[in-house]
Each structure stands twice: as C-alpha cells, then as structure tokens.
A protein has these predicted regions:
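N-terminal binding-site loop/beta-alpha segment at the start of enzyme catalytic domains
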Residues: 1-72, 132, 136
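Acidic (Asp/Glu)-rich catalytic clusters
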Residues: 2, 27-30, 51-69, 104-110, ...
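Active-site mouth loops of central-metabolism enzymes
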Residues: 8-20, 82-94, 122-127
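Short, acidic/polar
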Residues: 17-29, 89-106, 157-160, 182-183
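A structural motif
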Residues: 33, 109-112, 146, 170
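Structural motif corresponding to the early beta-alpha repeats
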Residues: 66-93, 118
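Active-site groove signature of glycoside hydrolases
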Residues: 105-125
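Beta/alpha (TIM)-barrel catalytic core signal, keyed to glycine-rich beta->alpha loops juxtaposed to Asp/Glu
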Residues: 119-277
Length: 277
C-alpha cells in the first residue's frame, strides 16, 4: 500500500459548490483541513476545480501530497447527468476504472487515499452491477492505487451483504446522518463491529429541527459553543468521521477546533437521543 496521510479527524466536503468550489477548497486547505471529500459526479461536484485547488496549494508549498487525504467516488449512471466520466456503454468494471483514472488526472496524482462506491445501483439487495463495481474497486485497492476503499448511501442490510462478500473489507461507510433515525445508530454499530469507519454528512443541514430544540440550545448556552461545534464534537466522540461543507472561514476554524472539544457522557447521551420522544 502507498504510504500517505493518516486518516483525518474531519473531511471537508466539496459537494454543491459549483463555481465556488476551487476557492472554497483552497480556503479549507488554508484553514488547516487535510482531508478532502469529492466525487467524479459533475451533477453535484466540480472535481476538476477541487483538483485545481489542491494542485495550487501543493505548487505553492503550502502542503505536500503526502499530507493530504483525498477521497473520491464512483457514481453509477443513474446518479449522474449527461457529463459522464466514463463510457456508459462500457462494462461496469471499465466504468469504475475510467472514473478512477479521470479522478487521478484531476488531482495530478498516482493514487487516491480513499475511493468509494457512491451508492448502490439498486434499492434493495445489492445487484450484480453493485458487486461488479465493488470487485473493480477492490482491484484498485489490491493494486495499491487506492489506499482505502468504501461505500456510501448504504442501508444496514446492504452493508451486511457487502461485508459478507467483500474480498477487501471496506474501510469507510459514508451516510447522511439523521438525528431522527438515531444518527444511523444500527449502521454505526455494524461498522464498529467490523472495523469500518463511519463518515457522517449533512450532520447540521439534515437536523435543523433537533438542533433548534430547547434541550440542545440550552446545552450550547451552558457550554458556550455553537451548534456546529457541539455536533462535530459529538460525532467524533461516538466514533464518526464527520464531514463539513461550510463556506465560512470562521466556521472552518471552529469546526477544526471542535475536534478537541470533549463532552461529558450525559451530554453525549443528550445529543444521541435528541429525537427520542
């Protein structure tokens, strides 16, 4: 395996930023983020711009490639628009390879720290196409081109099925994380049992009502911290690798500082059960 950066405590998410992508990625790197999450899915990401920001930071001597943790994803055609990073007529395994090579070009690198299946092609059990994509991703790990591999937007049953068939175990699972669903508690538990690191995204935007509740606001006031700081501290304390996509330099600073914040067990329990009646 290629030696690279340690797995970071937080990832900067680059989705939904369009023409601001390069500038915000550069700002995140300047603020101290070393983990960058993107996808070769032009519908929601602008990976070329992410790559430009990374290359500029390296060229300026602000960071080295070895200090960066770069994560991209393969997205099936159903999750793409017309701007595909692969030949849609090619076999799925070839699509994975083409998407991966394109991501390498975007970052001007010869490896990725993490390469993730962006979501299954099926809603129920994993399909033959899902398995074919996973085998192609495993091959990238086996060749050393991807240091770690993982999946995203998987249900509990899909993750259980994958763990049963994987030759190379997934290192990461990335899901949107809802307080009203126990912060994906069952999936997090299965991840912990199998050494899979749970990456949580939309921790703030998916939980506005819960974070506006009286108990949580009282906790923020008592601790003198923002809702974002406490949510990211909570995420780290329960074993998550959180993503933040903030566009504010000040919030970037606070999100990084929150990683050192420690919560009392009772406060962790309060946040864990915010949506419990």
């Amino acid at each position: 395996m290629t030696e690279g950066a340690p797995i970071p405590k937080v990832l900067y998410g680059t989705a939904w930023k369009e023409e601001r992508t390069e500038g915000l990625t550069a700002l995140a790197l300047q603020a101290g983020f070393r983990g960058i999450d993107t996808a070769n899915q032009r519908k929601h990401y602008f990976e070329v711009a992410v790559g430009k920001a990374v290359q500029s930071a390296i060229a300026a001597g602000n960071v080295t490639r070895a200090e960066l943790f770069l994560q991209s994803k393969f997205t099936f055609q159903g999750g793409q628009d017309h701007r595909l990073p692969y030949d849609p007529a090619a076999p799925v395994a070839s699509q994975v390879q083409q998407s991966f090579r394109s991501s390498l070009e975007h970052f001007a690198t010869d490896y990725l720290d993490s390469f993730v299946l962006h979501g299954p092609n099926s809603r129920g059990t994993l399909s033959p196409e899902d398995v074919e994509a996973w085998r192609a991703i495993e091959a990238l790990a086996e060749s050393g081109q991807a240091r770690f591999i993982g999946v995203s937007n998987f249900t509990l049953e899909q993750l259980r099925q994958l763990l049963g068939l994987a030759r190379v175990a997934p290192r990461f699972l990335q899901n949107r994380c809802y307080a009203k669903k126990g912060w994906d508690r069952a999936v997090r538990k299965l991840c912990a049992e199998h050494g899979v690191i749970y990456q949580g995204f939309s921790l703030l935007t998916a939980n506005r009502a819960e974070l506006d509740s009286a108990p949580f606001k009282a906790l923020c006031k008592r601790m003198g911290r923002s809702s974002a700081e406490l949510v990211f501290a909570f995420a780290r304390q329960v074993g998550m690798l959180p993503l933040t996509g903030t566009s504010s330099a000040e919030h970037m600073r606070l999100d990084l500082a929150a990683l050192e914040q420690s919560l009392e067990p009772a406060d962790v329990d309060l946040i864990e059960n915010l949506a419990t009646p």
